Structure formats: structure tokens, C-alpha cells
């Protein structure tokens, strides 16, 4: 019975990790500003090594980051003939192609690549009205050109927290 459980576990882990051993040949990421494609040198299959000078994105844009195990195309969405299509008020699809032309043979391939991105960047927030500073905020007097953003306590003052002594370079007593 233990042998059957052991063999079942081996088969389970083999199947689970075999999916992770395969590497994606093309990965695409995008935003409202950038289109990034990462290509593995064994793009076509495991027998043909694709050199960086044999591939380009869209209308002739070469890879701009070349590493031993991948080539990366990083371009603005307005470059390289990247096409933009709004599919909803909130989502845009960017698309292009990876073109492969072998220097050693007449082989040529075109691989379509696309990516969806939100129209609004999650990093940008809606504008809001600024409130007048409250009484506890530092304000600059009308005739003064500088102000203190914060002040550090004097060394003789004890910190107002329950921090361990080593945080403030104090020795335990």
C-alpha cells in the first residue's frame, strides 16, 4: 500500500513540475505607453537557434535588450507600427508581429503578438481639490521663504514609542 502511495506521489509531482519546465517562447506585456515582447532564442523549435539579428518587431524594430536566454523588444505603443484597437471603454488591445528571416536559408515566419491593457493607468489617480492647511500642519509665514517639514527630536529627548532600544542606538540598562 505504501508503494502505491509513493508511486502515485511520484507521478503527481512529475506531472505537476513538467508544466513548469516548459518555457514560453514568446511573452507579451503592455501598458497604455509601452509594448514589451520577450522572445526565446529557440523561438521556432528546440532545433533551430534564432539569432537576435534575424528577428524584428513590426516595421523593422530590432530587439533592444539582448541576453543569452532571451531577446527583448521594448517600444512605445506609437512606434514600430504597433496597432491599437479599443474593444471597450476601459480596455485597449495592442498588436504587432515578430518577423523572423533566417540569414542562412530562405525560411521566413511571422508570429502575431498582442496584449490587452486598461485605458486608464492604475498609477494615475483622479484629480482632487486641495484643502486649505489645517492648524496642525506647518504653514509658511507670508514674509518667510522657508519652513520645516519635520523636526528631529533632540538627543536628550526620549522617543515617544515602544521601540526596542537598539532602534535609536541606545544601550539597554
Swiss-Prot record:
Signal peptide range: 1-23
Gene Ontology cellular component annotations, sorted alphabetically: extracellular region
Annotated keywords: Developmental protein, Secreted, Signal
One Gene Ontology term from the biological process aspect of the record: placenta development
Keyword Cytoplasm attached: no
Superkingdom in the source lineage: Eukaryota
PANTHER family, A to Z: PLACENTA-SPECIFIC PROTEIN 1
UniProt function note: May play a role in placental development.
This protein's name: Placenta-specific protein 1
Annotated organism of origin: Rattus norvegicus
Gene that this polypeptide is encoded by: Plac1
Amino acid at each position: 500500500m505504501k508503494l502505491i502511495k509513493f508511486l502515485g506521489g511520484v507521478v503527481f509531482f512529475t506531472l505537476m513540475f513538467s508544466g513548469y519546465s516548459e518555457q514560453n517562447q514568446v511573452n507579451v506585456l503592455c501598458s497604455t505607453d509601452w509594448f514589451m515582447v520577450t522572445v526565446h532564442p529557440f523561438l521556432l523549435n528546440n532545433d533551430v537557434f534564432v539569432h537576435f539579428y534575424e528577428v524584428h518587431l513590426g516595421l523593422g524594430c530590432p530587439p533592444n535588450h539582448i541576453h543569452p536566454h532571451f531577446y527583448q523588444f521594448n517600444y512605445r505603443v506609437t512606434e514600430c507600427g504597433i496597432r491599437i484597437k479599443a474593444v471597450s471603454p476601459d480596455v485597449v488591445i495592442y498588436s504587432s508581429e515578430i518577423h523572423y528571416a533566417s540569414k542562412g536559408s530562405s525560411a521566413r515566419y511571422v508570429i502575431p503578438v498582442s496584449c490587452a491593457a486598461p485605458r486608464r493607468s492604475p498609477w494615475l489617480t483622479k484629480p482632487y481639490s486641495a484643502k486649505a492647511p489645517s492648524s496642525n500642519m506647518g504653514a509658511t509665514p507670508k514674509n518667510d521663504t522657508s519652513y520645516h517639514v519635520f523636526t528631529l527630536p533632540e538627543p536628550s529627548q526620549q522617543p515617544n514609542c515602544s521601540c526596542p532600544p537598539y532602534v535609536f542606538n541606545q544601550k539597554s540598562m
